[in-house]
Amino acid sequence: DIIPMGFGFTDEERVKPVELEKNGIKVALFNSVFLRLENWIQTDGEPGICMAKGNELAARISSYKQKHPDTKIIAVVHWGVEFMPYPSHQQQMDAMLLASAGTDVIVGHHPHIVQPVKKIQNCTVIYSLGNFVFDQKREDGNKAKMAKVTFRKNETEVILYDIDIVKCRPEVSRK
């Protein structure tokens, strides 16, 4: 089953995390778009996406973490500057806010190319996974990462796999 996240009819529904539990480990997934989207207008009473900015999302995560201290938290964020190979100043500031709020893993996307992975406090920040299925003419747009996140009681493991986009299809890199 695919569980929608970062979606709803009200701001409250949109910012609410998806909660999962497996083998006694609880995980909350938050999803937000930090950028203004082309051709997208949020309309009252209509379904929409979470557009909480970094400070708003960090406040929500902090509040959630206080109520659920043993729950692991993943924030999936649409942020950054297209085709920039390193995180923008704003991404770095937002990552610090989210890490300080108690986020365990941040998974970023939007730049269309891979950006670095960094550890901030106890949070693994994947600034951009790159493209996964996307028709790009640029060489750097045909590379991506796939993240495998494993939570244990006192440990978070993040493994990144290199992905090549071949004819718009992702393939695990053989290199």
Regions flagged by a language model, labelled:
Residues 1-175:
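Acidic, metal/ion-coordinating pockets
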